[in-house]
Amino acid sequence: MIQMQTNLDVADNSGARRVMCIKVLGGSKRKYASVGDIIVVSVKEAIPRGRVKKGDVMKAVVVRTAKDIRRPDGSVIRFDSNAAVLVDNKREPIGTRIFGPVPRELRAKNHMKIISLAPEVL
């Protein structure tokens, strides 16, 4: 469950290391984002010579949350940290690699490029 001011790790090689959510997209009163939702983020920490710089405002897809994800079969999946992948306006990832596992709920939200780049889909 991601809301405004939430800090997230970046799970790609775009150059950003930490980002902060500044808006949850999808309605004027929407407060929370879950896995697969698109948020607007500000880059808080970046590596030198990366594609993005500190202070850049980007869109990102939430790929991991510490809050439980409930599945229709009754199982529950949760991660140790909150993580996102930076995307452009066409929802294509900015980085060329994804680090760490991603849940298969991303497939239902049509983030196929992220699924194909991920090393493991849970």
From Swiss-Prot:
A molecular function annotated in GO for this UniProt entry is:
large ribosomal subunit rRNA binding
Q: Which domain of life is it from?
A: Bacteria
Taxonomic path: Bacteria, Pseudomonadati, Pseudomonadota, Alphaproteobacteria, Hyphomicrobiales
Describe the function of this protein: Binds to 23S rRNA. Forms part of two intersubunit bridges in the 70S ribosome.
- Which GO biological process annotations does it have? translation
InterPro entries named in the record: Ribosomal_uL14 (IPR000218), Ribosomal_uL14_bac-type (IPR005745), Ribosomal_uL14_CS (IPR019972), Ribosomal_uL14_sf (IPR036853)
What is the name listed in the Swiss-Prot or TrEMBL entry for this protein?
A: Large ribosomal subunit protein uL14
Sorted alphabetically, the keyword list is: Ribonucleoprotein, Ribosomal protein, RNA-binding, rRNA-binding
One GO CC term, this protein: cytosolic large ribosomal subunit
Chloroplast among the record's keywords? no
Q: Which SMART domains does this UniProt record tie to the protein?
A: Ribosomal_L14
Q: List the disulfide bonds.
A: none
Q: Which organism is it from?
A: Chelativorans sp. (strain BNC1)
Q: Which protein family is it in?
A: Belongs to the universal ribosomal protein uL14 family.
